Amino acid sequence: MLQNIAIGQYVPGQSFLHRADPRSKLLFIILFATLIFLANNTVTYAILIGFTLYAALLSRLSLSYILKSLKPVWILILFTVVLHIFITKGGTVYFQWGWFTVEEQGVRQAIFISLRLGLLILISSLLTLTTSPIDLTEGLERLLGPLGKIGIPVHDIALMMSIALRFIPTLMEETDKIIKAQTARGANFTSGSLVRRAKNLIPIAIPLFVSAFRRAEELALAMEARGYRGGVGRTRLNKLTFTWRDGIVAVVSVILVIVIGWWRT
């Protein structure tokens, strides 16, 4: 049920996205996320969707595999859609039954919000799928570097963010194992009232928390055994350098800003 979660995983490769500098990818993700929230009409969202699909092709990864990153949040997206259809009012009334109405603004907001969530998750998945944990950590550290001058532990922050991303598929896999084990013991997570289903989650939550703390402790012990000192005196075999690929990323970023700004109403 939870296997093959794409977000948080890294798939080695030699594609354009794999070989681009992690700093340029991180900066582009921030810019793209901003553009997602600035988009407010069909044309701007169509442009962003088209670009996301093209980026997926550039990664040379299976599109179906990338789309699996939406699996863990499809319930959240569905809930958001229903919530906006019920609450947001305005415009043409499409359907009415007593006090309940489905109106133009509600449908519009439901579609746009679900697209925002989906695009954010997909573009974030492309980042982790095409960037190794080491490169991602170093890229974050280099971008946050100026904060180190005022005493902020930049390396530790970058490492924590990288580990948090990489723990997502691990915890999802652990959740899947626990669900299968509880199902084998007779637990039922697919039927019954909402309250009963919530109670059935307790046998999953407790072992999952225990497993998460155990894995965190094992990771801490492994880092300590290898002499981890927070990046003090650390050297690097391969230093990050900007290439022509990053120039293309910069040009594409400028073009996207201009196009979205032009079509935004």
Curated annotation (Swiss-Prot):
Its main location: membrane. The chain crosses the membrane at residues 29-49, 73-93, 110-130, 143-163, 242-262. GO terms for molecular function: transmembrane transporter activity. Keywords: Cell membrane, Membrane, Transmembrane, Transmembrane helix, Transport. GO terms for cellular component: plasma membrane. It holds the Pfam family CbiQ. The keyword Secreted does not apply. It is a multi-pass membrane protein. Transmembrane (T) component of an energy-coupling factor (ECF) ABC-transporter complex. Unlike classic ABC transporters this ECF transporter provides the energy necessary to transport a number of different substrates. Belongs to the energy-coupling factor EcfT family. Forms a stable energy-coupling factor (ECF) transporter complex composed of 2 membrane-embedded substrate-binding proteins (S component), 2 ATP-binding proteins (A component) and 2 transmembrane proteins (T component). May be able to interact with more than 1 S component at a time. This is Energy-coupling factor transporter transmembrane protein EcfT. It comes from Brevibacillus brevis (strain 47 / JCM 6285 / NBRC 100599). The gene is ecfT.
